């Protein structure tokens, strides 16, 4: 008998499985499929409800929760799509594509303007465009709109047209980066404490991003030898260094910014001002047309804090372990000179300047890029300086390979005009040249001089990729300035000087050379960065960084790395030279043995180290060795929590000092949809709030280490790229055994600074066999569906009311639906019995006309990317999800 029952089950499953396996079909039905219900060998074939399977591609009239895709690219995560009967063919239905949904399709403007609407303008008339069709897959809960590419705006694999950009939801945010360092000097038994931080407070209102940047510092020194004054001194400060707001203007491919800021320019030197700007945003362009960001490299002899500032404002701060470092995530909008400060835990400090001179200024033929600004200059303390100014610059792709660019900036007593030409030389690389002329009327008695002075500044840039030899040469930003040439920043300074002040740091000549080479035949990489600066009234400065890396194998040990790094930094009449040598040997899975040698004029050290990556979140390194002053010991530990990135470091130098450091970088985001503590990538930048209902500890991954939802089922993903098609997903390999991801993948293309929101779905609970009985003793028809209170489908009723249920919880109420509406409700026992596969008897109360039974406005179905698991006990009833093997 048991064998016969299993045979009947397999027959039922095969019939329904064949229908579901047909795949997505056009919403316009083809010839109906006739079912012979006697073939199913069911006692009461009149009770079967197979209407949803009877026509190939037919969708029953009603409303459904569906994912919407255009040519396989997701554009809407959870839309309510209404299917209506086609007046021209009563046997067919069509989906109502609303104006809001059609605006996301990415149609060219001239195509979208000609669309015809029906149902009082609420639905797109079907069959308007040749080749356009819709496909609905209820088993995957998706609606795919197929549109020929000729009707669509440009897009690529990771970039969407502006019509699909997401401005996000309203919310507030607080991002922070806090560094703490402690140092104990053995020679005087003194202690130093330093806590510094920076971050952003903000709010999003529609397309507007409101932001305020802050930075703070607290320093305390305790000298035990100064008994009378308790040997202590402290200093502290807190600054709100910038208040500003911005929004994207998609129609112009530009960003409008109001408030305080620094002049963004590819031609002129920057300065602080308050006002407004309208700037073409390269991030809004497809990825292959975007610009360049500065690259900062250096060497830390010990665990150190690296701070990058521009005109006093901190734009980057982080702790780095001993050895060479390279910072490549500076915002590409930063322009001008940057100041780098490396504070070693040993107490030593390195300082130097780097230039963000860009590669040759080229624009695609027919395109125009521009930057407009107006306002009043101001100092660090928000005080106005000088008069009202305006600034404008543009680059025009005049012909294939040629770009003309220039700009002007001025106020009442200062004007500057620039003109340049860029050329793509194809196989010979690319170059640009420009000249800037300045004219300034100086105030009487200025230390910079009297009267009107004029001067010129000349600049040239060159870049070349040598693909045949896998190398790149960039001669970026050669610049020569005449003695009387004056920047706007220098002119502003003339209004604040005193009679004893002299003009310092007056640039004469500067150039930066960067070269990288990969010698693949011998597994060697070379990188050179050299900067030379001369001044009219102070000594020259030179800095260079040379790195050679070699990768090789020895016997069964593979991936050995040998690196030599030489550097020189000159700043404020001081020179710092050094060589750093490192050898890294893999030692099993995720473990490495290393040797590090640091050699300079004032100190030499040799260390051996051990590194281990414990898991995706934890790694540490321990080093021990000897320096000129004695033994050394240091360690570094990093933990990537869901709520913050945490770095801990410690150093010991025999007879000299003991030190430690702590860095915490994180943020908090709060919206009407919920909020969470989280890691941060860029202060005040874009983020994606993921909502999985009330499920805690659900792993969500973007492009880096996964984060886990908090107690409220929320997580914030910060590793998202502006104007890219980002994808996040639930890591199903880390889900508990009683959890199943129903909606596990989401996509979003966010504008800069947006707080995106996506709902994902996890079904948690026990699995059980049940038997549903109606009030009159009968059973629901075959094919009836069972939902929970969150409208998640838990199972499909088989013969005799049997149903295999997943995701059930004690005391939960279940809704049983057929014929397009909820017919009755059943309650699960609390607590659930120990043996859930013996068959739960579930009385179903109510009928179509009773108060307990209500017709749902929408019909949630199986969601996109349903994940399935294999169960040890196979159900003997038709399930809404088939276990995989």
PLM region descriptions:
Residues 2-9, 15, 27-290, 602-669, ...:
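Post-signal-peptide, soluble extracytosolic/periplasmic N-terminal scaffold domains
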Residues 60-83, 694-704, 776-790:
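Short, ordered, surface-exposed loop/turn motifs in non-cytosolic proteins
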Residues 88-97, 330-335, 713-736, 740, ...:
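Short Pro-Gly-centered beta-turn/loop motif in secreted/extracellular proteins
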Residues 142-147, 360-364, 744-765, 829-864:
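Extracellular beta-sheet/turn segments enriched in Thr/Pro/Gly and aliphatic residues
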Residues 165, 195-207, 231-250, 386-400, ...:
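Feature captures outer-membrane beta-barrel proteins of Gram-negative bacteria and organelles
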